[in-house]
């Protein structure tokens, strides 16, 4: 086992604080509408340029192991805030640095670290309640756009795109962000249910120009297993031909003779037909087939339920006004499903969302809700270069998460003003002893740090700005760093989601409390490396050619 290096008390805390400062100083330059970029070297390709706090934090690893421990703890603040709220990572980092810095000074002055932490926790709880009380619901798409704009470092176009996408898909909808190959950023809304499976043969195409199969007023057969032979389906196919409607087969797979027969019938014009694979895998495939069945008013033909293809009749098939199938995707528009059954299915999936502990499962379940009840919007982010596209995509992701958070818990004044106003609630708060009071004072001072940093990044004296905002009796009065004006922040459209600000403070105080109460640090001692072997001796008596 390798030898360990152990550091205690002041020595340990000083090294840890140095690491905290290095990481926080790198992250906080990105804060606010006039925040600067951070350029990150990549092992291959162009460097990455970003204004996303958590992306910067994740890249930082320090050579000194004790300093690195401090940096990693603050990195945890950014990661936790990003996981919970999806934005506010820079604010959380700035708050954590401010609390740790003040807390370390208090510990060095001889105060009890445990009482300091109790005071910090007490103050944090009070401020969180004040933030929740100050929050108000999002009224309209303009406010959604404002939240998105602020989170995207002041780019109004991004805020507008997100507001448009939210309006089109509704509260149940899902918005995803992708990179666009062109220069323009655009929003594409998919109506109905879309899943990522395309036609099994290009011979099913009805529109050769676009290479898609467009089938209107179609029947949909949902089969859980593979189809290798069409013999059991002959009675059903004859009924479909008599109805003169198209048929879409959605099955685990359609192969061999079955696929060949379908293609021949399609080419001869006897049958308007297309076949696609069922979406998903395993249990998720079964669930998604059931979703399609409920949306289209059909049934899933399953051996588990004792159903046989020979016995399938037209009334067991799903129906849809239009089905569009491309090489990669299938979209079902206006399914004939019963509204009450669709709502019951959505409620059932929502219950699963609440119960699941897996983020991946939660995301997939939310997508299923969106496909049944709302819609799916895709924001395709464009730019002149790949580096620019990636930088903008980071900001669109942040803005999207911020708008979701705003819808969940409401909005408060932005620009760091809400924290400064909430700090006034701490004026009358007292702890059980003087050390706890010191912990409360630490939080009171730290709450001004984000506002100061936003001002300083805009080239203005942070202390002067914080003083003016603190003295104002108007809770909405603040400093708009974009225009460098003082006034009503709601009027300026500078608003933040309450959830983001609350989460940032809670996570910062939690990790800062742990750092302040650290008394000992243990790290592996670097092993001395052996000196490299000497070079080969000269070879005397040989003439050089």
Curated annotation (Swiss-Prot):
Its GO CC terms are: cytoplasm
Single GO BP term: protein refolding
Protein name from the UniProt record: Chaperonin GroEL
UniProt keyword list: ATP-binding, Chaperone, Cytoplasm, Isomerase, Nucleotide-binding
What's the family? Belongs to the chaperonin (HSP60) family.
Subunit comment: Forms a cylinder of 14 subunits composed of two heptameric rings stacked back-to-back. Interacts with the co-chaperonin GroES.
Which coarse location class applies to the principal site listed for this UniProt protein? cytoplasm
PROSITE patterns documented for this protein? CHAPERONINS_CPN60 (PS00296)
Query: Which top-level group of life is the source organism from?
Result: Bacteria
Q: Where in the cell is it found?
A: Cytoplasm
Instruction: Detail which positions bind ATP.
Output: 30-33, 51, 87-91, 415, 496
Q: Which reaction does it catalyse?
A: ATP + H2O + a folded polypeptide = ADP + phosphate + an unfolded polypeptide
């Amino acid at each position: 086992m390798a030898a360990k290096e152990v550091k205690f008390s002041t020595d340990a805390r000083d090294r840890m604080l140095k690491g905290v400062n290095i990481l926080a100083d790198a992250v906080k330059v990105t804060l606010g509408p006039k925040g600067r970029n951070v350029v990150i070297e990549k092992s291959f390709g162009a460097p990455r340029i970003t204004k996303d706090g958590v992306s910067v934090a994740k890249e930082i690893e320090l050579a000194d192991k004790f300093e690195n421990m401090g940096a990693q703890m603050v990195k945890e603040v950014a990661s936790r805030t990003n996981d919970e709220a999806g934005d506010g990572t820079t604010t959380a980092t700035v708050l954590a640095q401010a609390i740790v810095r003040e807390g370390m000074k208090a510990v060095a002055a001889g105060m009890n670290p445990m009482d300091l932490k109790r005071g910090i926790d007490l103050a944090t709880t009070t401020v969180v309640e004040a933030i929740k009380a100050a929050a108000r619901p999002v009224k309209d798409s303009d406010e959604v756009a404002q939240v998105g704009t602020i989170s995207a470092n002041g780019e109004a176009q991004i805020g507008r795109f997100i507001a448009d996408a939210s309006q089109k898909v509704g509260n149940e909808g899902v918005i995803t962000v992708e990179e666009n190959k062109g220069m323009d950023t655009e929003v594409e809304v998919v109506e109905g249910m879309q899943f990522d499976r395309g036609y099994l043969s290009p011979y099913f195409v009805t529109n050769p120009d676009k290479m898609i199969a467009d089938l209107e007023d179609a029947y949909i057969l949902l089969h859980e297993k593979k189809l290798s032979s069409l013999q059991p389906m002959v009675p059903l196919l004859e009924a479909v031909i008599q109805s003169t409607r198209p048929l879409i087969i959605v099955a685990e797979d359609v192969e061999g003779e079955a696929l060949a027969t379908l293609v021949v019938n399609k080419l001869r014009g006897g049958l308007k037909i297309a076949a696609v694979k069922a979406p998903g895998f395993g249990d998720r495939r079964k669930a998604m087939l059931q979703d399609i069945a409920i949306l289209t008013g059909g049934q899933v033909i399953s051996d588990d339920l004792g159903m046989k293809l020979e016995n399938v009749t037209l009334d067991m098939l799903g129906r849809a006004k239009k089905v569009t199938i491309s090489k990669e995707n299938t979209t079902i528009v206006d399914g004939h499903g019963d509204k009450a059954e669709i709502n019951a299915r959505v409620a059932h999936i929502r219950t699963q969302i609440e119960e699941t502990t897996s983020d991946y499962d939660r995301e997939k379940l939310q997508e299923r809700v969106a496909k049944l009840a709302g819609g799916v919007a895709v924001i395709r982010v464009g730019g002149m270069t790949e580096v620019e596209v990636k930088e903008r995509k980071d900001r669109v992701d942040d803005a999207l998460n911020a708008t979701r958070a705003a819808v969940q818990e409401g909005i408060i004044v932005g620009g760091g003003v809400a924290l400064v106003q909430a700090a006034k609630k701490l004026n009358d708060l007292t702890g059980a002893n003087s050390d706890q009071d010191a912990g409360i004072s630490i939080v009171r001072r730290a709450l001004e740090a984000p506002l100061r940093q936003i001002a300083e990044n805009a080239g203005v004296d942070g202390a002067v700005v914080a003083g003016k905002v603190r003295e104002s009796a108007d809770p909405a009065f603040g400093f708009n760093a974009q225009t460098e004006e003082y006034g009503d922040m709601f009027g300026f459209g500078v608003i933040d989601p309450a959830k983001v600000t609350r989460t940032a403070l809670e996570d910062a105080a939690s990790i800062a409390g742990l750092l302040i109460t650290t008394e000992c640090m243990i790290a592996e001692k670097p092993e001395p490396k052996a000196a490299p072997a000497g070079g080969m001796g000269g070879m005397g008596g040989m003439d050089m050619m």
